Amino acid sequence: FITNSGDVNNVLNTEAGLKRLGVADATGIANYLGLSKEKVEWKTVNGKKYCYVNNQRVTGERQIGGNWYYFDGNGVMQTGFVNLGSKTVYYNSDGQMLYGEQKINNAWYYFDTITGARITGFYNLPGKTVYYGSDGQMRYGEQKINNAWYCFDTITGARVTGFYNLSGKIYYYGTDG
């Protein structure tokens, strides 16, 4: 940023200054949009995957090629569930963070479409309300939640309201559980 009149005269009044300012602006915009020309190199050592950006080993969270990855303190790419502060996220076998509804080890989960945070509790999906337990897994059948009984379809996980045949018995579930 130009903050004083001396910089205005030195930068804006010379061809070299304008060129330098243009490069700085273009670099800032490219970095902001994730379009920078970083040199990215992947290496596998003893079955562990590492990423180097501009010859520096990556640690922590990093967006590479439009996908988010997580590397531990030694730079090892992580997969599976990872606790990141106040949220739990999931990285697939390629190390990429997953979003939205995902089936993992035969269980359904939902991850926030922006942050990737695993969702727990009641959640509205298109056409149905479902419930994800404290472990993030979608619940089915009869469930006691906060001292109230709810029923969730045994196939879709959709919350049931009204009369419902559960194991050969007819039950009524109100809209409040």
Which residues make up each language-model segment?
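Active-site-adjacent mobile loop/cap segments within catalytic or ligand-binding domains
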Residues: 1-37
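Extracellular adhesion/carbohydrate-binding repeat motifs centered on closely spaced tryptophans
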Residues: 37-177
